[in-house]
């Protein structure tokens, strides 16, 4: 049974402005594993990756119902499976989780569905 659904839409240029003012912003948002992947990319791909992880984590926080106030970005990790699809590899939710991240032009959108295992 679906117990939560969260959606987030983010302008990539807004993330870029924050990142340009404070490059440590990426360390606040990304886990150690995510940061290693982020650092392997060229600049433009880094921005898309960072914005995608931001949006995915915001969508997760909305789906679980707490928002990012009670969770931190470090409580949530989004990596890719062997096919390159994003998956939630770390979160406080114990059920099944499904995530989709899409980029188009200057926007990134993420959707998270949480499903109870019962």
From Swiss-Prot:
The keyword Transferase applies. Its EC number is 2.7.8.7. It is found in: Cytoplasm. Mg(2+) binds at residues 8, 58. Its cofactor is Mg(2+). The keyword Cytoplasm applies. It is an enzyme of class 2 (transferase). It comes from the Bacteria. Pfam families: ACPS (PF01648). Transfers the 4'-phosphopantetheine moiety from coenzyme A to a Ser of acyl-carrier-protein. NCBIfam families: acpS, pantethn_trn. This is Holo-[acyl-carrier-protein] synthase. It comes from Streptococcus pyogenes serotype M1.
């Amino acid at each position: 049974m679906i117990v939560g659904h969260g959606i987030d839409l983010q302008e990539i240029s807004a993330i870029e402005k924050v990142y340009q003012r404070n490059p440590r912003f990426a360390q606040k948002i990304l886990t150690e594993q995510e940061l290693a992947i982020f650092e392997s990319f060229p600049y433009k791909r880094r921005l898309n990756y960072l914005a995608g992880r931001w949006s995915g984590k915001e969508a997760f926080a909305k789906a679980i119902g707490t928002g990012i106030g009670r969770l931190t970005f470090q409580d949530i990790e989004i990596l890719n499976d062997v096919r390159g699809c994003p998956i939630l590899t770390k979160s406080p939710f114990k059920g099944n989780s499904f995530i989709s991240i899409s980029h188009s032009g200057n926007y990134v959108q993420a959707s998270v569905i949480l499903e109870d295992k019962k």
